[in-house]
Every structure is written in C-alpha cells, then in structure tokens.
C-alpha cells in the first residue's frame, strides 16, 4: 500500500530530477544581441560554436553571443530563413555544452514543456506549460504554410530564439512569438534540424512529420 510519505518522497525526487534536467538545458542557453535595442535567446546547437536563434533576434546588426559562463563573442551569421524565422550563427569557441535535440514528430498535445530565455533581460528564466496544439501557420513565402507548436508556457520579450524543451530536457522547439497574450508559438525541432542541415551543418537531423490539420 502506498502511503502519504511515499507520495511525498516520489514528488520530491521528481522535482529534483526535473530541476537537474532544466539546469542541463540552461547550460546550452545563450543571450543574443543582434538588434539595436533589446536582446533575445539562442541555443548552442553544436559544441563547435553553432548557435541557433530567431531571425528577428539577429536583425541587421552584427550579432554578439553571451554564453552562460559570461564569455561574449562576436558572431558570424552563416544562414537565415525569414519565413521560418530562424538564423544560424557561428562563434569562435569549442567544447561548448550543446543542447540535446529531440524529434518533435513524437510530440503530443498536453505534453509537459518548459520555455527558457531571458524575458525582459532577466537571464536564464524558466517557465512551464503544456503543448496546447500542433498546428500550422500561413506564411508569405514559398512554403505557404509551416508547422508550429502552440503552448501556454508564459513567454515575454527576450524569450525569442530560446528553447522549448520536453520533460526529458531535450529541445523540441524554438520559441518565436506570443499570440493573444497567453499563447506561445515555437518552431518544431525537426524544421530547425532541416534548416541547419540545409546550411551544411547536419549533426542534428530528424524526419519531417505529417502536416497537422489545424490552421491558425
């Protein structure tokens, strides 16, 4: 028979495990200064200095990347895709703590997720939510529509480009925008992997999922 003490012990162990997972993801979280005003987030995609972020975070300015250990580097823009709002940067650093990338094809509505970023300039904040919907968004580019992840994990300016991670601490999306004040939108990790692969940096790659039916 399971008693109240057993439940409390299990809850405590689960909380400790989740906190440890989040700390590991935070080590791969960076701050990206690309626009004249403000900053966004990004993730270390590859240990050799590849940084993935949002295209709108980079803007037209020379981007700078601030690592979790407070080292800052001027970054080189190696690829960008405004339609899916992603940009790939390279910094002159090695042996970095790269993020673990999950296959967003297996993501389910209702799944627990965490959003990491620097809301309002506060570094390394974590918020929690669930996957609200797996849908598509219309674009003005050649794709016409792109898959998106909608979540109720609270986002704010400074979260853009940061990771959306699952309960295992692996990245399943890149936080991109806020809709209606209470819904976040993220680009799925498989689409991010395709973007990186098309740029010639293909260490992480997952297959495309079937298009979702819901359209926003």
Annotate the PLM regions.
Residues 45-46, 57-59, 101, 107, ...:
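Short, well-ordered loop/turn sites that connect or cap secondary structure elements
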Residues 12-20, 28-48, 71-74, 100, ...:
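A conserved glycine-rich beta-strand in the N-terminal activation segment of trypsin-fold
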Residues 35, 54-56, 112, 118-119, ...:
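Short, surface-exposed secondary-structure boundary micro-motifs
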Residues 26-28, 87, 91-100, 125-203, ...:
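Active-site region of chymotrypsin-like
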Residues 60-77, 94, 108-114, 123-137, ...:
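Beta-strand/loop subdomains of soluble extracytoplasmic proteins
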Residues 1-22, 75, 115, 119, ...:
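C-terminal cap/linker of serine protease catalytic domains
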Residues 20-21, 43, 76-78, 94-123, ...:
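Active-site substrate-binding loop(s) of clan PA
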Residues 1-2, 37, 46-86, 91-94, ...:
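Catalytic-histidine neighborhood of serine endopeptidases
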């Amino acid at each position: 028979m399971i008693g109240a003490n057993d439940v409390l012990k299990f809850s405590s162990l689960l909380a400790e495990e989740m906190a440890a997972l989040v700390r590991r993801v935070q080590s791969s979280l960076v701050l990206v200064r690309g626009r004249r005003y403000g900053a966004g987030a990004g993730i270390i995609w590859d240990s050799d200095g590849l940084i993935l972020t949002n295209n709108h975070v980079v803007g037209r300015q020379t981007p700078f990347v601030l690592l979790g250990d407070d080292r800052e580097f001027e970054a080189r823009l190696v690829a960008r895709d405004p339609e899916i709002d992603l940009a790939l940067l390279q910094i002159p650093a090695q042996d970095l703590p790269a993020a673990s990338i999950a296959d967003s094809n297996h993501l389910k509505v209702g799944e627990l997720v965490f959003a990491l970023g620097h809301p309002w300039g506060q570094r390394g904040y974590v918020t929690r939510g669930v996957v609200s919907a797996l849908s598509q968004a219309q674009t003005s580019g050649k794709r016409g529509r792109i898959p998106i992840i909608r979540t109720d994990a609270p986002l704010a300016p400074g979260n853009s480009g940061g990771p959306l991670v699952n309960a295992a601490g692996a990245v399943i999306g890149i936080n991109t925008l806020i809709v209606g004040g209470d819904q976040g939108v993220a680009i799925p990790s498989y689409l991010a992997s395709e973007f990186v692969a098309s740029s010639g940096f293909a260490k992480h790659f997952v297959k495309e999922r079937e298009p979702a039916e819901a359209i926003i």
